[in-house]
Regions:
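Short, glycine-biased loop/turn motifs at secondary-structure junctions and
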Residues: 1-165
Length: 165
């Protein structure tokens, strides 16, 4: 049995790790998967830099965007205006639906609409995303569309947001 590391947190798995949230052995840094990684947020083995997938890397890799190689590192992506905006997509949004705007199915599912005059509809992820997109200024929409390799169809598949609406 390996020695107990008092700096380890419960979410670590593996042996001889320093840092937090590591899976694997002989890791220094945080949020690593694999073995013998130094740095943060690596998947793979023996990496000396951060945000790598693969093995034996000493510099940060460029990331794939829209299924194609880009000239952007993950660190650059994290610091980008586009990521900041995408992280603002609301979740768990509700909308008041008046009785006169309800379908027969909604009325059957929400009989209290007769007393309250409607019901609160919980919007799904794509509806929330589309509302977010509609609220963006043209300048902010262009920030999203300027993501390297931007592809509207792939963006829709991943976010549920149609950029042409």
């Amino acid at each position: 049995s390996p020695p107990v590391n008092s700096d380890r947190v419960q979410s670590d798995t593996g042996h001889y790790n320093t840092g937090q949230y590591n899976t694997g052995d002989f890791i220094t840094g945080n949020f690593n998967r694999g073995h013998c990684n130094t740095g943060d947020c690596n998947t793979g083995d023996w990496n000396k830099s951060s945000f790598n997938t693969g093995c034996f890397n000493t510099v940060e890799q460029k990331i794939m965007l829209f299924n194609k190689p880009s000239d952007m590192t993950y660190r650059e992506w994290i610091d980008s205006d586009a990521r900041y905006l995408l992280n603002r997509i609301p979740k768990n949004v509700v909308e008041w639906i008046y009785s006169e705007d309800m379908t027969d199915e909604e009325k059957a599912e929400h009989p209290t609409h007769e007393t309250t005059g409607g019901y609160l509809k919980v919007l799904d992820k794509s509806e929330c995303g589309q509302l977010w997109w509609g609220s963006l200024s043209d300048r902010r929409k262009e920030i999203i569309k300027a993501i390297p390799n931007f592809d509207a169809e792939i963006f829709f598949q991943c976010t549920g947001v149609r950029v042409d609406e």
